[in-house]
From Swiss-Prot:
Catalytic site: 208 (proton donor), 338 (proton acceptor)
Lineage of the organism: Archaea, Methanobacteriati, Methanobacteriota, Thermococci, Thermococcales
SUPFAM superfamilies per record: Enolase C-terminal domain-like, Enolase N-terminal domain-like
Molecular-function GO terms, alphabetical: magnesium ion binding; phosphopyruvate hydratase activity
Predominant localisation class: cytoplasm
Gene name linked to the record: eno
Function: Catalyzes the reversible conversion of 2-phosphoglycerate (2-PG) into phosphoenolpyruvate (PEP). It is essential for the degradation of carbohydrates via glycolysis.
Pfam families per record: Enolase_C, Enolase_N
Protein name per Swiss-Prot or TrEMBL: Enolase
Cofactor: Mg(2+)
Gene Ontology annotations for the cellular component aspect, listed alphabetically: cell surface; extracellular region; phosphopyruvate hydratase complex
Pathways per UniProt: Carbohydrate degradation; glycolysis; pyruvate from D-glyceraldehyde 3-phosphate: step 4/5
Amino acid sequence: MENPYEITAIVAREILDSRGNPTVEVDVHTPIAMGRAAVPSGASTGTHEAVELRDGGKRYHGKGVRRAVENVNKIIAPELIGMDVRWQREIDKLLIELDGTENKSNLGANAILAVSLAVAKAAANSLELPLYQYLGGVNAYVLPVPLSNVINGGVHAGNELDFQEFMIMPIGASSFREAIRWVSETYHVLKRVIMGKYGKNAVNVGDEGGFAPPMKEVTEPLDALIKAIEEAGYKPGDEIALAIDAASSEFFKDGKYIVGGKEYTREELLDLYKELVSTYPIVSIEDPFHEEDWEGFVMITNELGKKIQIVGDDLFVTNPRRLKKGIELGAANALLLKVNQIGTLTEAMDAAYTAFRAGYSVIVSHRSGETEDTTIADLAVALNAGQIKTGAPARSDRNAKYNQLIRIEEELEGIAVYAGKNFRKVFF
């Protein structure tokens, strides 16, 4: 008798991401269903991330992924065909073994992850379950607070802002649908605020849909956000809070942090963060120090960790080993979860549970180069993470995730809980 959950075919192809760069998409087939997944790509990447395989050469300026696609079609597919699509952990283990390197540089993390995610989707579709329920079970019911990146700086934009992201968090909303409305309304008011001060050319958007105005001082975007929140009719802090991704590895040079043209020591930069947190309703700071500045992370966690969320992105790169080191040291109190930093769904979920067990919060995150794939929306609900970071409410690659969360909330009507002000500890 035919096993309806047996993998019968795996097909990979090269498609384009939101920046017009190639990425990998994979279809996994069973006799009764198909799962499709496409992988994202980051601009500010941590040194310890799993490695994307790119072709080099002239084609696509060296960014083609035909080698990764070939690795799926010729190496991975023959090994997985015949396996039960529901064996996610076994399949991911096999993918890691087939690659044989610690950073997945042989087959490519982009090839491996596309297969891993497509397997999960094929299993969910074969079982006629929504992906969030397949991954999280009947207890997956918490809708996340969006950390919406509405002003872009750093490597995501062409302005002089050193900090990479300035985000709004609708913590006072009563549902995800209300939260995303608050974000959208504030975003449109922000456009007006920026145009009024910097002119109509200042509302071009960055990779993640946020505006990239000609700002330089770190306080300029924060002041603009407060003004936009108030003019949209909301209360800064109580209803809509602020969050920052400093991405400080990008402005760390020769042992110093360069912000706004000024040099800062670790201690001076910590003082700047403390001043910002005391002045503005900031509830989360991501990558406040360089990815190897463990001491800086410990310092800021000791100083501000009881009051706000200190997030490790480049610090942890969704890597369980680096996360465990951070937990032992007391560095940061939150994990930014990016599935493509580690390369398989199993490893990403393991990292999330490691964080939860240590009392760390988890933010499921997109990358700056995205696709229309909505897996991370389902993953945020599956984990009851309470937070998702997936850009401004603009550009279809970002809104695809928000729209999926709206659908999930609708499916869970009567059961769904919006994390709101409990975004850091949804069950406490």
